[in-house]
């Protein structure tokens, strides 16, 4: 993890490189990639990529499960550093494993929970988003438009439920192609198997730079809040 508290975390070796290669190979073999969209529209000057949403496709269920497992493990690590990513949005009460008493979840109590206790709480509040595989072609592809992940769209306002973004780098060695964060003045260099987590809001406005000597492959999605009716009932 980084030393500076900029809320951008990169977890190296989060996914085995062999699995990353399989994702790339299956993506290319599928022939199902389509031009990437921005906010529902096709604007190649803003985003030039070939995309494949694997969620909901039976033939990709194994890969989707493996990726969500890796992301969840990283999410627990992230919330152990940034406790209020979980406890600031929603007041939660749990049974303290030490004495069984009902207590409000605060930073001290969260830190005392092991993964077995913390995991179900996190799953109660958050859910995984649809996973998108993307290819950015050498010297041309990229997402040069400065953007964030949080915006109002659709009757269900699904994008407004996004809390964190994540990107898994599936290959490296192509030069450039960094994920660049505007306000943090930070560039994340792709490294096979590394998993990036960062907030979805405008504070972490970012862009994807063009790869130089080879195609860049990523898997990407979000950690979203569950719907209000799940968390609060009704």
Region locations from a protein language model:
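Fe(II)/2-oxoglutarate oxygenase catalytic core
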Residues: 1-195, 203-234
């Amino acid at each position: 993890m980084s030393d500076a508290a900029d809320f951008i975390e990169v977890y190296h070796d989060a996914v085995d490189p062999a699995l990353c290669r399989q994702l790339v190979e299956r993506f290319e073999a599928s022939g199902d990639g389509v031009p990437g969209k921005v906010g529902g529209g096709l604007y190649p000057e803003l985003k030039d990529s070939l995309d494949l949403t694997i969620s909901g496709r039976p033939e990709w269920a194994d890969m989707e499960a493996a990726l969500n497992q890796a992301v969840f493990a990283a999410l627990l690590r992230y919330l152990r550093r940034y406790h209020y990513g979980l406890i600031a949005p929603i007041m939660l009460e749990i049974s303290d494993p030490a004495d069984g008493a009902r207590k409000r979840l605060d930073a001290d109590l969260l830190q005392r929970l092991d993964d077995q206790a913390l995991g179900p709480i996190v799953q109660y509040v958050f859910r995984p988003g649809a996973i998108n595989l993307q290819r950015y072609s050498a010297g041309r592809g990229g997402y040069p438009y400065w953007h964030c992940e949080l915006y109002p769209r659709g009757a269900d306002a699904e994008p407004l439920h996004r809390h964190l973004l994540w990107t898994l780098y599936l290959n490296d060695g192509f030069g450039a192609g960094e994920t660049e964060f505007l306000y943090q003045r930070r560039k994340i260099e792709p490294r096979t198997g590394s998993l990036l987590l960062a907030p979805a809001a405008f504070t972490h406005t970012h862009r994807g730079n063009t790869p130089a000597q080879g195609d860049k492959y990523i898997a990407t999605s979000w950690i979203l809040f569950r719907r209000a009716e799940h968390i609060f009932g009704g």
